[in-house]
Each structure stands twice: as C-alpha cells, then as structure tokens.
Amino acid sequence: MSACQTPLIVALDFPTREAALKLADQLDPALCRVKVGKELFTSSASGIVETLCDKGFEVFLDLKFHDIPNTTAMAVKAAAEMGVWMVNVHCSGGLRMMVACREELAKRSGPQPLLIGVTVLTSMEREDLAGIGLDVDPQEQVLRLAALAEKAGMDGLVCSALEAPALKAAHPSLQLVTPGIRPAGSAQDDQRRILTPRQALDAGSDYLVIGRPISQAADPAQALAAVVAEIRG
C-alpha cells in the first residue's frame, strides 16, 4: 500500500541535486510524491532516485523515453531497477515500442512501476502541432495516441486536464497524470492547457503534477499543505 495519501506529485525541477534535496527535505512523503525530470537526472545521475526513495518518496521518473523498441524497453527496465514508482514514454514512439516496454516490465518478479504514455505536451497548441506536420487539434491527437496506449497495455497517460473527461469516458481503465496544475491565482508560466487542482480532479485526473507554485514558494511545506486542503475541500 502506498505511503502517500494524496494524488499530488511535486516536480523537482532544479539544476542541481543539492537544490532538489533541499526542497525534498521540506516535503512530507505522506502528502506528495516527487518527479525527477531531465535536467535534474542528467546533472545528478541515477543516485538522485535512490536517495529520494531512501527518504520515503515514491518517484516519478519523467524522462519521456522515445527510441527504437528494444532501447526504450531497456531504459524502462533500468528505471524499474532503480525503484521508481512511475516511468513514462512517448506514445508517438509507436505501438511496438510501448508493447516492448510493457513486456519487459512483465518479466520482473518484484514491484513494477506504473508505465505511463505521454500524449501531447501541455505547452503545445494547434499551431505548434501544425509546425511538425500534424494538422489536428491537440485534443484529437491526444485521443489518437490514447487509443494506441490502451492497445499496448499501458497503465495510464500524461495529459492536460482539459483532455481528461474525454479520456476517462473512452478509456476508463487508464490512470491520468496531469501536469500544468496551478492553484487559483498562480501564474500560468509556459503551461497552456491548465486547470486548478480541484478542477483537474473533478475532470477525471488521477494524479496532479505541481511545480513552481510549491517549489518556488517562500514556504514549500505550507504551499503543499494549502494545495492538499484545496483538493480535500
């Protein structure tokens, strides 16, 4: 059973291990999980994941793997061996890539991390997709990739809260992980398709990723407690 009692995932979006651990030391693993992304992982190597696990946190390794099937599957296997709770891959890598990852995790005798597919990045709008040759609305592309992810046996999807209602209706078994969450009154920064924590949960999101409103707060522990209070009503 998970030690974390909320759907919150705090993004440790820092350039150094020291800065990330300074924030982690102010957070309660019972109130949030943590996300390790590309910058932090690259600057501190795999040891950051083990250190966070030792502190009691469940870790979402957000590296968005996207490569040929075997290479991606081996990367997912390595992440599982670190003890991560969740790992993600780009759905646009295709069905065979996602199936290879699923099959590799199925070989494990120990705990398996949640395998999550990335659909359309929350910073992208229709004009951004058009720029890479996709003349579709973000919502339509999300639904296309979601169907592919379900066929591959993925555990869930990263998606914006605006796509969550349609995804829950079409794919109720998939767990939805939503970035771009901003408590009421927060700046939007570079995330375009956003909702508040309560709105996102009501829309069908299962896990909420929150970064700067907590990580850049004067008192991160207090900021986290405020978000917990908001979602608990």
Swiss-Prot record:
Coiled coil: none annotated. The keyword Lyase applies. It catalyses: orotidine 5'-phosphate + H(+) = UMP + CO2. SMART domains: OMPdecase. InterPro entries: Aldolase_TIM, OMPdecase, OMPdecase_AS, OMPdecase_bac, OMPdeCOase_dom, RibuloseP-bd_barrel. Pathway: Pyrimidine metabolism; UMP biosynthesis via de novo pathway; UMP from orotate: step 2/2. Its EC number is 4.1.1.23. One of its GO terms (molecular function) is orotidine-5'-phosphate decarboxylase activity. GO terms for biological process: 'de novo' pyrimidine nucleobase biosynthetic process; 'de novo' UMP biosynthetic process. The active site is at residue 64. GO terms for cellular component: cytosol. Keywords: Decarboxylase, Lyase, Pyrimidine biosynthesis. Catalyzes the decarboxylation of orotidine 5'-monophosphate (OMP) to uridine 5'-monophosphate (UMP). Homodimer. Belongs to the OMP decarboxylase family. Type 1 subfamily. This is Orotidine 5'-phosphate decarboxylase. It comes from Pseudomonas putida (strain ATCC 700007 / DSM 6899 / JCM 31910 / BCRC 17059 / LMG 24140 / F1).
